[in-house]
Amino acid sequence: MACATLKRALDWESMNQRPPKRRRCNPFGQAGSNAGPASPSRDGPSTSAGLPHTPSNRFAKDSTEPSPFSESSLAKMSPDKMAESLCNEIKRLHKRKQLPITSSALERMQDSESSGSEMGPESPRRPDSPQNLMRHGEKALFTFKQVQLICESMIKERENQLRERYESVLTTKLAEQYDAFVKFTYDQIQRRYEAAPSYLS
């Protein structure tokens, strides 16, 4: 009875070895995007995968330091302060002839400012209020362009205050960094002179 045998090419070749496959050709520039996750090495798992990601000391220090703008000298805009600034801006523009409003509208604004609330159509009138204000209570005081002019002036003033505050803080920080740099340079120079060998040594 005859039997057929198959001879292996190499004696040390593994019996369960998979046949070699050709590597797939990837277009240029896509080799990194199509690559799979990195496999652990044979010696052991990689240290980068086992250790958690921690920020550097410099960034950790910056995150713990309080921001110089947290306690800014600029007070927050409360509704009362905003109303006061708005009335002052209206009076200033009226004096400069940039806000043409009637005297009755200006008196109405001052009356509403002293009363503490705007005189609306549904709000109760004070007993000492003039009759013309009660009659023309629903009439608008300013047009849209006038309101836009007032808001632009207030925003510009607030922007100038914030810019001055930012520049002062930035100047202080730059001065501190310069002083630290000068001190570090001086210490390095002193160490070099101290470590330099003398003639007697």
From Swiss-Prot:
Disruption phenotype: Homozygous embryonic lethal; early to mid embryonic stages. Embryos display a range of somatic body wall muscle defects. Embryos show morphological defects in the heart, such as abnormal spacing between rows of aortic cells and abnormal patterning of the aortic outflow tract.
Entry comment describing in which tissues the protein is expressed: Ubiquitous.
Taxonomic superkingdom: Eukaryota
Compositionally skewed regions (Low complexity) per UniProt: 112-122
PTM notes: Polyubiquitinated via 'Lys-63'-linked ubiquitin by Hyd, promoting interaction with rel.
Disordered as annotated region, ranges: 1-133
Keyword Chaperone appears in the UniProt entry: no
Chief subcellular location: nucleus
Subcellular location: Nucleus
InterPro entries: Akirin
Ranges annotated as biased composition (Polar residues): 44-57, 65-75
Keywords for the protein's UniProt record, in alphabetical order: Developmental protein, Immunity, Innate immunity, Nucleus, Phosphoprotein, Ubl conjugation
Gene Ontology BP, a term: positive regulation of peptidoglycan recognition protein signaling pathway
GO molecular function, one term: transcription coregulator activity
Sequence similarity: Belongs to the akirin family.
Other comments on record: 'Akiraka ni suru' means 'making things clear' in Japanese. The name is given based on the presence of the clear nuclear localization signal.
Function recorded in the entry: Molecular adapter that acts as a bridge between a variety of multiprotein complexes, and which is required for embryonic development and for normal innate immune response. Acts as a regulator of embryonic myogenesis by bridging Twist (twi) with the SWI/SNF-like Brahma complex, promoting expression of twi-regulated genes during myogenesis. Effector of immune deficiency pathway (Imd) by acting either downstream of, or at the level of, the NF-kappa-B factor Relish (Rel).
Protein name per its UniProtKB record: Akirin
Species the sequence originates in: Drosophila melanogaster
